[in-house]
């Protein structure tokens, strides 16, 4: 937006009612369509920032935290229409504290940058990525679902319940039997949480676990896995920058565990590789990484069998495979059943 279209929002902030727990949101500013049209003619690119805060003592709400508001949807649509008509690009920066819905609007943007909450140097950090001074190499630590209803925890978590507010110490929360699982949650999903659920049951997602783009490309080769004397496994894989700019790559290794399709068992990042340059990463996969908790034994148990390792760029982008053989089941770690 050009200089003459800047607006002071101090009055909007001052008008917000006092809220000791910080749950109240600042009303979203609406931008006149004429301003957007004028900016599309004078500016090189549009950058839209979608913000979400975080806090303590309350869960993020589905309607106001996960979903974008009507004002945010209209802003993205109007800016996209105006700038694309002028053959210019639109970038959406997600300055958020958790997963937000992206499936309904991401096609309107040419790029989506997930900055999380980067603090006072956010502007400088994001600018360096957008201008190409830094080649992005971050990866998602969670799955972005198409809908919240697709999550395995959807049926068991009171996602739209907002407890009572109080100044000072938390009050005794009244019993609310009409709302499911407010006071007690039965985690019936068990191991099937996040990507372990989505990938095991082949559920479509917006962005898979471990996903992340780069300005360059990488090739994987020469994967070798060997058993070590201590019972762990040493994996090496060669990564080559096949693109046109320098960058780093995150290699991720997944293995099947019990009934799970796979779970992350190792990962590593290369140094900055110049175009055409290669590096061989050495990763260790421990017995504990491959083990699953057995309630009957109160222990982490490594099952016998053949394990196929998937080596790739994210949970749904396997580039290479390697194999591990475990000849007999092994109790890796015992724990005490103190909660029984």
Task: Outline where the language-model segments fall.
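Short, surface-exposed ligand- or partner-binding patches at beta-edge/loop junctions that are enriched
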Residues: 285-313
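Secreted, periplasmic, or luminal enzymes acting at the cell surface/secretory milieu
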Residues: 8-24, 95-248, 254-256, 303-304, ...
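Intrinsically disordered, low-complexity Pro/Gly/Ser/Thr-rich segments with frequent PxxP/GP/PP motifs
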Residues: 259-295
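Conserved small/polar residues in nucleotide/adenosyl-binding loops
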Residues: 1-6
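An anion/phosphate-binding loop that grips the pyrophosphate of nucleotide cofactors and donors
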Residues: 43
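Glycine/threonine-rich flexible loop motifs
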Residues: 50-70
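Acidic/histidine-rich helix-loop elements
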Residues: 9-33, 57-64
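A short helix->loop->beta-strand "cap" motif at the edges of active sites that frequently abuts
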Residues: 82-90, 109
């Amino acid at each position: 937006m050009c200089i003459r279209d800047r607006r002071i929002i101090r009055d909007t902030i001052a008008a917000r009612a006092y809220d000791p727990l910080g749950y109240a949101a600042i009303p979203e500013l609406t931008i006149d369509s004429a301003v957007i049209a004028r900016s599309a003619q004078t500016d090189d690119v549009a950058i839209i920032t979608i913000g979400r805060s975080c806090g303590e003592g309350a869960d993020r709400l589905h309607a106001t935290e996960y979903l974008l508001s009507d004002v945010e949807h209209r802003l993205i649509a109007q800016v996209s229409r105006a700038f694309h008509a002028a053959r210019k690009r639109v970038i959406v920066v997600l300055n958020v504290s958790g997963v937000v819905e992206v499936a309904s609007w991401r096609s309107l943007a040419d790029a989506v940058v997930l900055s999380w909450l980067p603090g006072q140097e956010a502007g400088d950090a994001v600018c360096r990525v957008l201008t190409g001074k830094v080649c992005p190499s971050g990866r998602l630590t969670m799955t972005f679902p198409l809908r919240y209803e697709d999550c395995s925890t959807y049926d068991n978590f009171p996602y739209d319940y907002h407890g009572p507010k109080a100044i000072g110490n938390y009050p005794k929360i009244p019993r609310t039997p009409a709302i499911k699982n407010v006071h007690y949650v039965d985690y019936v999903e068990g191991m099937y949480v996040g990507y372990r659920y989505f990938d095991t049951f082949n559920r479509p997602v917006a962005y898979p676990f471990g996903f992340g783009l780069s300005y360059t490309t990488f090739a994987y080769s020469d994967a070798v896995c060997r058993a070590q004397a201590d019972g762990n496994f040493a994996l090496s894989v060669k990564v080559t920058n096949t693109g046109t700019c320098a960058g780093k790559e995150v290699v991720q290794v997944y293995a099947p565990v019990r009934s799970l399709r796979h779970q992350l068992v190792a990962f590593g990042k290369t140094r900055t590789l110049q175009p055409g340059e290669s590096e061989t990463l050495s990763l260790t996969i421990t017995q504990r990484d491959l083990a699953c908790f057995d309630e009957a034994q109160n222990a982490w148990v490594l099952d016998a069998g053949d394990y196929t390792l998937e080596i790739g760029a994210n949970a749904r982008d396997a580039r290479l495979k390697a194999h591990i053989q475990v000849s007999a089941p092994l109790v890796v770690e015992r724990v005490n059943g103190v909660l029984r």
